From Swiss-Prot:
The gene is virD4. GO terms for cellular component: plasma membrane. This is Type IV secretion system-coupling protein VirD4. It comes from Bartonella henselae (strain ATCC 49882 / DSM 28221 / CCUG 30454 / Houston 1) (Rochalimaea henselae). The keyword Chaperone does not apply. It is a multi-pass membrane protein. It is found in: Cell membrane. NCBIfam families: PRK13822.1, TraG-Ti. Keywords: Cell membrane, Membrane, Transmembrane, Transmembrane helix, Transport, Virulence.
Length: 639
């Protein structure tokens, strides 16, 4: 572990305080014996070794207790070394005093050592007692569970940190944690407090664990409860280190202001911020990738079908009627969107979602009349067939379909959000050039009401990478914080399964596994776990998630000692037996109750589970110096 100059000075302080104690004890004794009688002076002088050794140990003990927890272990080591040197000096002086008598008149060392100064002997003993107390206080408590040497019922174990350094070297670009065991640190039994550095332990100074997108699908899922430092421990550090393009969903709207200048310094990058509440926001046309005439028309038609799904709320319903209206609303949106894109009626600047909304904002009768006109005039068989469903539909049925489609595109009536997805400041394909970053400052309150806003923007960028067909400079990292707000997105599953070859890597953040199951179902959630390079868990409060982690970490074999005692008049002392039992590597209640918020468990295929720290940016000086002030948290001083 690397220490700063200040920390090294604090760690070496026992040497200075011990030397000062050795210097002051004789002066203190000479001051005390000034007015004493001769017979009293003798014992005070004799007590000098005892006082010196005891005070050296006592001063180091009290000094250690006054220091931060993560420094105490190193201070104890220095204190022990200094005390041993001091003790050896006094013992050596006694041996030197007794040495001339050894060999005379048959005197041996065994006999001569009986005449060692008792003050030295007791001083050494009492000093080591104080040092033992210091060691006990500074050493973290170890687990009472005794692992068996034989893995009869399982041999699950945590990944060795050397192996972790090989898999996740410190010189990578995507920061996932810090290479140290929080549960073995001095502060393991103290809750993590961001404003109290004494609770940080080795956090902020340990080497980083980083991912180079060099194994598996390159996708990642992070689970952390509310207030679990998802943004500060992973999103911000990664934005400071990843040199490729980033598309970042930020419902808290705090990330871009913190990292935009750091991103711009990385090779003169173009940092685009999509913020509907800012006058300086950029905008683009989310349909621009569908307007590329170099792509075959049949493929563009298929893309329109998939994109239309992003506009609809994908809430699962057991009501067959609601399911029917949702399906037909999707068909209606597909037909109208295809008309907007392919019809000669519109200029290129009008081929956007505003035009789609303008059609749907008409009365039902006007929409039906326009659909009939489209059916009669369009040369496209695809559009004609899609529209034909609705021209002969019963009025009441069409009313339900129209209401569903109108409701799910209602957000396009909000001018600032409509402008965001219907502009021309840049193209979605720009992210393939390797020099463009996009931050989506979409407030959580808006995404809760209109998740389609986030879906169409992210979907446009994902589809732009597919359209690029492997023609990209660097892999695009999609950092989707609070991705649960977007609801179900089929395109995310497509990116998960085929995104690696198209240059997309997903970094998804959920509060619990239940959110993943809610949108993708049990089978879908299993597919996500199987397809990701790794899954990280931290700050878990949900019992079911804790049970899932416990099961995935595996079982180990432990030794259990049983003791039986005899009662009554029996003279036997009882018996003791040892048996082997199965135990989870970590139990659900240990995950919820004992794991600190700056600790995480990382699971990946083919390797043992990794238990390590989290790279919270404000604990690391180099990261803190690179970021701007976070308006949601007090800023520590940069040094």
């Amino acid at each position: 572990m690397k220490y700063t100059k200040t920390q090294l000075a604090l760690i070496s302080m026992p040497i200075a305080s011990g030397a000062l104690t050795i210097f002051l004890v004789p002066h203190m004794l000479s001051f005390v014996i000034n007015d004493l009688k001769t017979n009293q002076i003798y014992w005070y002088v004799r007590s000098e070794p005892l006082l010196t050794l005891m005070l050296v140990a006592a001063v180091s003990l009290f000094y250690t207790l006054s220091q931060k927890l993560h420094l105490r272990k190193a201070i104890t080591f220095v204190s022990t070394a200094f005390f041993c040197i001091t003790a050896l000096y006094y013992i050596g002086s006694e041996i030197k005093r007794l040495n001339p008598y050894v060999g005379q008149q048959g005197i041996t060392w065994g006999y001569a050592l009986k005449f060692m100064d008792p003050m030295v002997v007791f001083g050494v003993i009492l000093g080591f007692v104080l040092l033992a107390i210091q060691v006990i206080i500074t050493s973290p408590r170890t687990s009472n569970v005794k692992r068996a040497k034989k893995g009869i019922f399982g041999d699950a174990a945590w990944m060795n940190l050397k192996e972790a350094a090989r898999i996740f070297p410190s010189n990578g670009q995507i920061v996932i944690g810090e290479r140290y065991r929080v549960d073995q640190d001095n502060v393991r039994n103290i809750p993590f407090a961001p404003g109290n550095k004494t609770t940080w332990g080795k956090g902020g100074t340990a080497p980083l664990l980083t991912f180079n997108l060099d194994f598996g699908s390159t996708h990642m899922i992070f689970f952390a409860g509310s207030g679990g430092y998802k943004t500060t421990s992973t999103v911000v550090p990664t934005c400071l280190t990843y040199t490729g393009p980033i598309v970042c969903l930020d419902p808290s709207t705090e990330i871009a202001p913190m990292v935009k200048f750091a991103r711009k310094k990385m090779g003169n990058r173009n940092v685009i911020i999509l913020d509907p509440n800012s006058l300086l926001t950029k905008n683009f046309n989310v349909l621009d990738w569908l307007l590329d005439e170099n792509i075959p028309r049949t493929r563009r038609e298929a893309n329109i079908v998939s994109f239309s799904k992003l506009l609809l709320s994908e809430k699962k319903s057991e009501n067959s009627s609601a399911e029917y209206f949702s399906t037909q609303a999707h068909n209606l949106l597909t037909a109208l969107l295809a008309h907007v894109i392919f019809s000669d009626k519109y200029e290129d600047s009008e081929r956007n979602l505003k035009t789609l909304r303008a059609i749907l904002s008409q009365s039902e009768t006007a929409v039906v009349n326009q659909l009939r006109m489209i059916q009669e005039t369009t040369p496209s068989p695809f559009i004609r067939e899609m529209v034909g469903i609705f021209t002969e539909m019963a009025d009441q049925t069409f009313s339900g379909v129209y209401t569903t489609a109108s409701k799910d595109t209602q957000w396009l009536s909000l001018s600032n959000y409509a402008d965001l997805v219907c502009g021309n400041d840049f193209a979605s394909s720009d992210i393939a050039n390797g020099k463009t970053d996009v931050f989506l400052n979409l407030p959580a309150s808006i995404l809760n009401s209109y998740p389609a806003i986030g879906r169409v923007i992210i979907g446009a960028f994902l589809n732009a990478m597919v359209t690029a067909d492997g023609n990209y400079k660097k892999r695009v990292l999609f950092v989707l914080d609070e991705v649960d707000l977007l609801g179900y997105m089929n395109i995310l599953e497509e990116a998960r399964d085929r995104g690696r070859k198209y240059g997309t890597s997903l970094m998804l953040f959920y509060q619990s596994s239940g959110q993943l199951v809610n949108h993708f179902g049990e089978a879908g959630a299993r597919s996500w776990f199987e397809s990701c390079s790794f899954v990280s868990y931290a700050a878990i409060k949900d019992l079911q998630t804790a049970k899932d982690i416990s099961e995935r970490c595996g079982q180990m074999t432990i030794e259990v000692t049983g003791t039986s005692k005899s009662r009554g008049l029996s003279l036997t002392k009882g018996s003791q037996n040892i048996n082997y039992q199965q135990r989870a590597l970590i139990l659900p209640h240990e995950i919820i109750q004992e794991m600190r918020q700056d600790e995480q468990i990382i699971l990946m295929q083919g390797h043992p589970p990794l238990r390590c720290g989290r790279a919270i940016y404000f604990r690391r000086k180099e990261m803190l110096a690179a970021t701007e002030k976070n308006r949601f948290a007090p800023q520590a001083k940069k040094s």
